[in-house]
Amino acid sequence: MNAPVKPSHLIKGATGEWEMVIGIEVHAQVTSNAKLFSGASTAFGGDPNSHVSLVDAAMPGMLPVINEECVRQAVRTGLGLNARINLRSVFDRKNYFYPDLPQGYQISQYKSPIVGEGEVVVDLADGTSFVVGIERLHLEQDAGKSLHDQHADMSAIDLNRSGVALMEIVSRPDMRSSEQARAYVTKLRTILRYLGTCDGDMEKGNLRADVNVSVRRPGEPFGTRCEIKNVNSIRFIGQAIEYEARRQIGILEDGGGIDQETRLFDPDKGETRAMRSKEEAHDYRYFPDPDLLPLEFSQGLVDALKADLPELPDQKKARFVTDLGLTSYDAAVLVSEHESANFYESVLADLADARRDGKAAANWVINELFGRLNKQGLSIEASPVSASQLAAIIDLIGEGTISGKIAKDLFEIVWSEGGDPRALVEARGMKQVTDVGAIEKVVDDIVAANPDKVAQVRAKPQMIGWFVGQVMKASGGKVNPQAVNDLLKAKLGL
């Protein structure tokens, strides 16, 4: 039975409405010092062919030996995806010819992958969430790289990537919009980074997506899909899907048919172009690799790895909401990047009262800090304001030493000049005025100067905010707004 189609997910064509169906295969480079079947380095940026073993170059007589750390990383990832771990899996040869594939085949897993079905819960910007099913995760070798701009009449081959371990994470076709697809890949990358199993660096090619797109009339069976190969940014994933869906709709509405094919996305033109006809599994002539025994490990290994998993984004988000009273949205923003969550937790650790000021800390991190970082194009690691400095500013507010307005001025000073917030408050005379007599004098002056406003506020008590603002302005923001509010109510008989 087909699930109801959300109107926002439908695309209007010339002859009616269409629905996208999207599935994604993510190729994530395993975080490991050595390759999947050799001891060669996986370091990025070396000279061409400087990280190549005899196994990677497919020299005769060289046999592959499995890297245990890559197996552990795949199991950790499967556990992080709430997936079934297969205690026995098999490596297969995927046969095809390409110049940068020296063996003439890729060692992969076909019928018996290391990880089975799982799922990812994905949050959207509007506060809703949806589930993407994971069909499987398998280990495989990466290929080398063909360089076509080194010589005018020939191509060069760099085998540094050849044999690097990849996890291919295959989703079910559960996405119905480019927004959902972008959100899914973003969430998956976040999980991998929390686990430490892939750094998710798409610019270096450490995370790449093959995006399968088809269109259909709502309620009809799946259409013929096209695969958009090796999309290397979240933004490009969205652009590629939007273009490809429109392209297919145009063909179908003109009476044509969709060819099942592999396509490439051209980010300069914002369009996809045909690469080759899409292969079926039988085209690759899979068979078990005779040089590798089946991969077997115990449930005890799985249990030990599970016990050692870090707190993952969904768990951290739930804790922030339950323990600190954060909104679901704020908690989701904070956990969306591992570094952001770590920064926020460092702020909490330095606060005098984390339970009291946890929500205030979230507001400061999200609105003030993230806003400033985004404006200047800086990462959280490059923040001029440290977690301990931000915690000190929040403590100064919480204990009544400075007002919220002065705190923003103090934040600007720390951002630009650095320094200890407490020392800066003392040195620059930024302390909040707490003397009731001094505050009362300012209030009396404002009330005496505005008799018309006094009459208005007595008729409409909610206008008291105008008086509070005037007092704050007259005092340079150095008085406690709540004290001003209470004093005004007493003076005006509200």
From Swiss-Prot:
InterPro entries: Asn/Gln-tRNA_amidoTrfase_suB/E, Asn/Gln-tRNA_Trfase_suB/E_cat, Asn/Gln_amidotransferase, Asn/Gln_tRNA_amidoTrase-B-like, GatB, GatB_C_1, GatB_Yqey_C_2, Gln-tRNA_amidoTrfase_suB_CS
Keyword ATP-binding: yes
Gene Ontology BP annotations: glutaminyl-tRNAGln biosynthesis via transamidation; translation
Classification via Pfam families: GatB_N, GatB_Yqey
Chemical reaction(s) catalysed: L-glutamyl-tRNA(Gln) + L-glutamine + ATP + H2O = L-glutaminyl-tRNA(Gln) + L-glutamate + ADP + phosphate + H(+); L-aspartyl-tRNA(Asn) + L-glutamine + ATP + H2O = L-asparaginyl-tRNA(Asn) + L-glutamate + ADP + phosphate + 2 H(+)
Coiled-coil parts of chain: none
Enzyme Commission number: 6.3.5.-
PROSITE patterns assigned: GATB
SMART domains per UniProt: GatB_Yqey
GO terms, molecular function: asparaginyl-tRNA synthase (glutamine-hydrolyzing) activity; ATP binding; glutaminyl-tRNA synthase (glutamine-hydrolyzing) activity
Keyword list, A-Z: ATP-binding, Ligase, Nucleotide-binding, Protein biosynthesis
Keyword Ligase: yes
Functional summary from the UniProt entry: Allows the formation of correctly charged Asn-tRNA(Asn) or Gln-tRNA(Gln) through the transamidation of misacylated Asp-tRNA(Asn) or Glu-tRNA(Gln) in organisms which lack either or both of asparaginyl-tRNA or glutaminyl-tRNA synthetases. The reaction takes place in the presence of glutamine and ATP through an activated phospho-Asp-tRNA(Asn) or phospho-Glu-tRNA(Gln).
UniProt record similarity statement: Belongs to the GatB/GatE family. GatB subfamily.
Subunit architecture: Heterotrimer of A, B and C subunits.
Designated name of the protein: Aspartyl/glutamyl-tRNA(Asn/Gln) amidotransferase subunit B
Protein's gene: gatB
